[in-house]
C-alpha cells in the first residue's frame, strides 16, 4: 500500500547490523562502535539497514539506556535479542558454545553463526490457518482432494476430535511443504551454485562443495510459520461457540464460512467458488448453462440474498468478533497457539535437507500475519 511504499522504498536487501552481545570467550562485545551505530540510527531514522542489539547479563547499563533512547524515537529500532535464550537454543541445534556466542541476525530476525552457516531462512511460508480451512472442507479445495480426509466436520461431537483433525491436517501439509522445499534445494545445488559466496563460508573450500551442496559447516532449512494469532482465534471460536456454549451448530458455522458470512466474495474468490460448484455439478451429471454460471458467480459476489440467512450469518460473525482474542494474556488461547507452534516445530525437526542438515521452524507472529 501507499504507506509501505513510502516507508520501505527502494530495493531493500534486508541487511542487518548487529551490535552488543559477547565474543567467543563469553566477554562482553559492546564497544564505542556499538554506541555510534545507535547514534547513527537516531540521526537517519531509516528502516534500513535493520539494526539489532544483543542483550545479556553482562550488557553495560549505559548501552541499555542508549538503546532505549533509540527506541523512544519511534523509528522501530533497534530489535532486541536475548543471548540468555538464543545461545542455548543454537546449541540445541548442534552449534558449539563458542560459535553460538558469536551469532548474528540474518535478514529479519533469524540468528545464525556468520561465515559458517547456510541457514536458508524463509525457505517457505506456512499458513497456520490453512489446515483449519481444510478441516472444514475435509481436505478438499476447489473441488480437488488436496489433503487427507479427516472426516465430515458436522459429525464431530467434541473439540478434541476437531482439534485432532486440525493437527492431522497440519502434519500432512508440513510434509508436502518439506518435499517441495527439498526439491528446490536439490535444484539449487545442481543449477544455480554460488561459488563466490561459498569461498567465504567455512568448510566449503575444504569440502570442495558450494553452500548449496552442503559445503557449509552448519546447514539448516527454516520455513516460516505465520498467521498463528488468527489460527488460535479460529480454534478458540470453534471451541467456545460450537462445543462449549453451543450457540452455533457446526453446520451453521461451515455454511457461514462458505458464504463469507453473507458479505460476498472477492472477484477471484467468487470465480474459484463458481468453478468448484460447476465441477461438482458436472460430477453429479448435471449440466450448467452460461447464464446459470453467471448467476452463481453473481451470488458469490453479492453475498447471501435470503434475509433470514444473512441475518444469521451476521449474528455468527458478531459473536466471533466479540470473543476474547490471542495476545491479551488469556491462558487458554495462548496455550492453543503454543501447542500448534510446538507441533509445527517438532514435526519439522523430523526432516532432513539434501545438504545433510536439519529443518528448524521459524514463526512470524507479526511480520507476515
Task: Specify the residue positions occupied by each region the protein language model found.
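Conserved catalytic cores of very large enzyme subunits
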Residues: 1-369
Amino acid at each position: 500500500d501507499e504507506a509501505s511504499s513510502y516507508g520501505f522504498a527502494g530495493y531493500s536487501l534486508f541487511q542487518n547490523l548487529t551490535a552488543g552481545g559477547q565474543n567467543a570467550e563469553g566477554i562482553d562485545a559492546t564497544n564505542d562502535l556499538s554506541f555510534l551505530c545507535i547514534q547513527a540510527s537516531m540521526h537517519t531514522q531509516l528502516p534500513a539497514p535493520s539494526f539489532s542489539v544483543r542483550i545479556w547479563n553482562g550488557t553495560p547499563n549505559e548501552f541499555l539506556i542508549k538503546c532505549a533512547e533509540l527506541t523512544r524515537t519511534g523509528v522501530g529500532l533497534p530489535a532486541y535479542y536475548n543471548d540468555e535464550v538464543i545461545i542455548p537454543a543454537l546449541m540445541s541445534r548442534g552449534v558449539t558454545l563458542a560459535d553460538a556466542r558469536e551469532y548474528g541476525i540474518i535478514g529479519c530476525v533469524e540468528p545464525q553463526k556468520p561465515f559458517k552457516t547456510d541457514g536458508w531462512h524463509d525457505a517457505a511460508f506456512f499458513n497456520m490457518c490453512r489446515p483449519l480451512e481444510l478441516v472444514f472442507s475435509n481436505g478438499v479445495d476447489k473441488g480437488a482432494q488436496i489433503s487427507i480426509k479427516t472426516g465430515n466436520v458436522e459429525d464431530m461431537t467434541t473439540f478434541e476430535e476437531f482439534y485432532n483433525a486440525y493437527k492431522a491436517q497440519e502434519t500432512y501439509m508440513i510434509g508436502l511443504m518439506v518435499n517441495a522445499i527439498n526439491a528446490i534445494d536439490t535444484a539449487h545445488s545442481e543449477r544455480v551454485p554460488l561459488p563466490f559466496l561459498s569461498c567465504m563460508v567455512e568448510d566449503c573450500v575444504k569440502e570442495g562443495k558450494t553452500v548449496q551442496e552442503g559445503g557449509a559447516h552448519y546447514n539448516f532449512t527454516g520455513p516460516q510459520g505465520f498467521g498463528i494469532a488468527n489460527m488460535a482465534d479460529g480454534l478458540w471460536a470453534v471451541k467456545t461457540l460450537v462445543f462449549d456454549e453451543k450457540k452455533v451448530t457446526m453446520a451453521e458455522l461451515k455454511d457461514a464460512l462458505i458464504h463469507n458470512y453473507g458479505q460476498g466474495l472477492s472477484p477471484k474468490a467468487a470465480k474459484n467458488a463458481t468453478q468448484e460448484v460447476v465441477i461438482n455439478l458436472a460430477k453429479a451429471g448435471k449440466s450448467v448453462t452460461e447464464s446459470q454460471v453467471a448467476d452463481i458467480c453473481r451470488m458469490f459476489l453479492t453475498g447471501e440474498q435470503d434475509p433470514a440467512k444473512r441475518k444469521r450469518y451476521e449474528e455468527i460473525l458478531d459473536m466471533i468478533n466479540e470473543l476474547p482474542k490471542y495476545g491479551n494474556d488469556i491462558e487458554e488461547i495462548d496455550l492453543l497457539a503454543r501447542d500448534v507452534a510446538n507441533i509445527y516445530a517438532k514435526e519439522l525437526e523430523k526432516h532432513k535437507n539434501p545438504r545433510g542438515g536439519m529443518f528448524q521452524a521459524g514463526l512470524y507472529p507479526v511480520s507476515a500475519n
